[in-house]
UniProtKB/Swiss-Prot annotation:
Protein name: BH3-interacting domain death agonist
Keywords linked to the UniProt accession: Apoptosis, Cytoplasm, Membrane, Mitochondrion, Mitochondrion outer membrane
Disulfide bonds: none
Cellular localisation: Cytoplasm; Mitochondrion outer membrane
PANTHER family documented for this protein: BH3-INTERACTING DOMAIN DEATH AGONIST (PTHR35447:SF1)
InterPro entries in the cross-refs: Bcl-2-like_sf, BID
Taxonomic lineage from the root: Eukaryota, Metazoa, Chordata, Craniata, Vertebrata
Length: 193
């Protein structure tokens, strides 16, 4: 198991949102594998507030998670799981509408990158980012740009895992990293609305 699948909790909103998106998406052929993300510490439960550090050690010290902004740790808002599930269901609906517009070549190329265990995490994240940006330009959408790109990133996660279920943990972790880097503030705004 890769070390980058563990979280210090700073990306728990992104993890919850992606997990709920995958659970709500139609045509998700790896549904039975989703609980393995929780059991292996990839997904932190808000109720339990259990997270793993980069060494895979369980952290229960009660520290609140946060996000760096201008070099300062800004606490994340409390996350209401019901709101996250509702937003994820709405995003999954949008993803289902965009699904057929994603060319198999884009997914196949991503699968090949994820299968290459010699590629560093940053390179795979860059490949995911390029795929999302390319799709966002190519797919006509009346969605706001951030929402379209967020949905596309999560949809690509589903499509890669559908094609190669053994990549679920790696693609989940990479997508959470990408979403956390690019859409954290957008997700916070969605949760507050």
């Amino acid at each position: 198991m890769e070390q980058d699948i563990y979280s210090n909790g700073s990306d728990h909103m992104e993890r919850m949102l992606l997990f709920a998106f995958l659970a709500e998406s139609s045509g998700c052929e790896f549904q039975e594998q989703l609980p393995s993300l929780q059991s292996q510490g990839v997904l932190c439960s808000v109720k339990d507030a259990l997270c793993y550090d980069s060494d895979g050690e369980l952290q229960t010290d009660g520290n609140r998670s946060g996000h760096l902004q201008n070099g300062e740790l800004v606490p994340d808002p409390e996350v209401n799981e019901a709101i996250v599930r509702t937003i994820a269901a709405q995003l999954a609906e949008i993803g289902d509408q965009l699904d057929k517009q994603i060319k198999a070549k884009v997914v196949n190329d991503l699968v090949q990158h994820f299968l290459n265990e010699n590629l560093p995490r940053e390179e795979i994240t860059r490949c995911l980012s390029q795929a999302v940006e390319g799709l966002a330009r190519a797919i006509p959408s009346d969605l706001e740009q951030e929402k379209a790109m967020l949905v596309l990133a999560m949809l690509l996660t589903k499509k890669v895992a559908n094609q190669m279920p053994s990549l679920l943990q790696r693609v989940f972790s990479t997508t959470v990293n990408y979403i956390s880097q690019h859409f954290h503030n957008y997700i916070v705004r969605m949760l507050r609305e």
